[in-house]
């Protein structure tokens, strides 16, 4: 009996535990990846605003709010920084700038990133009086900083810094979430729990399939699509 007990404790028990633990990890991985893919799908298939003239805002306190004005195709027409919040508190100057830009570039909608100072920036924007009806949206910033530092963004905007590129990405996400988000490695969009703990090969495969199926579902306008949508 002693020998059997010893053999069980020394040999069998550890191998059963290892196997059980591996099975549990696999199950947990599958579930986490399923949730991650579902979240990504929701983000990619968010309803696009379409071809409208958009102002993109990457909000901030000390560093100011980066403003970009985009035409209906998402091309950058203008960029500047305003400081409506502490510590600079240049509120009235910032308000004048915003109202002027909305009029000058005939802006139809404003996209505000959901990061630092987002709520205060939304309040600031909605409390101004404009010469037109404006839609104001708060947009997920996840992955925008990854995009703005990427080769893709550098190729498109070589003469602008990362903050301007980030604001452009926020504005474009409102116009066409799918077209903008496919430029970013899906794992960087940050819509999953424990994404660094799960099997990375499985995760990549699942996310690639999700992106592909969303692009196939929505279809692609060959005249306006970027190479990221077509590959």
Predicted stretch roles:
Residues 146, 155-231:
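Long, highly charged, low-complexity intrinsically disordered interaction regions
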Residues 59, 72-73, 81-82, 115, ...:
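Short, ordered loop/turn segments at secondary-structure junctions
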Residues 1-50:
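Extended, charged alpha/beta regions that create polyanion-binding interfaces
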Residues 107-117, 137:
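Short glycine-rich phosphate-binding loop at a beta-alpha junction
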Residues 74-107, 111:
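Nucleic-acid-processing active sites and adjacent nucleic-acid-binding tracks
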Residues 48-76, 174:
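Gly/Thr-rich phosphate-binding beta-strand-loop-beta motif of the actin/hexokinase/Hsp70
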Residues 120-144:
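Short acidic, glycine/proline-enriched helix-loop-strand junctions
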Residues 64-72, 80-82, 121-124, 147-158, ...:
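Short acidic, glycine/serine/threonine-rich loops at helix termini
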């Amino acid at each position: 009996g002693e020998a059997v007990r010893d053999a069980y404790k020394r040999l069998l028990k550890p191998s059963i535990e290892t196997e059980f633990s591996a099975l549990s990890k696999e199950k947990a991985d599958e579930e986490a990846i399923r949730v991650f893919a579902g979240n990504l799908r929701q983000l990619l298939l968010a309803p696009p605003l379409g071809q409208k003239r958009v102002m993109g805002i990457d909000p901030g306190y000390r560093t100011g709010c980066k403003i970009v004005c985009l035409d209906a195709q998402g091309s950058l027409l203008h960029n500047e920084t305003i400081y409506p919040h502490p510590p600079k508190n240049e509120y009235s100057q910032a308000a004048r700038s915003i109202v002027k830009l909305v009029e000058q570039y005939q802006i139809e909608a404003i996209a505000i990133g959901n990061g630092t100072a987002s709520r205060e920036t939304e309040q600031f924007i909605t409390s101004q009086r404009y010469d037109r009806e404006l839609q104001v949206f708060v947009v997920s910033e996840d992955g925008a900083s990854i995009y703005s530092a990427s080769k893709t963004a550098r190729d498109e905007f070589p003469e602008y810094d990362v903050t301007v590129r980030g604001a452009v990405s926020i504005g474009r996400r409102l116009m066409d979430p799918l077209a903008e988000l496919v430029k970013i490695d899906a794992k960087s969009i940050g819509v999953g729990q424990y994404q660094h703990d799960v099997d990375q090969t499985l995760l990549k495969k699942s996310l690639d399939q999700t992106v592909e199926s969303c692009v196939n579902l929505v279809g692609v306008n060959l005249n306006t699509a970027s190479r990221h949508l077509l590959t």
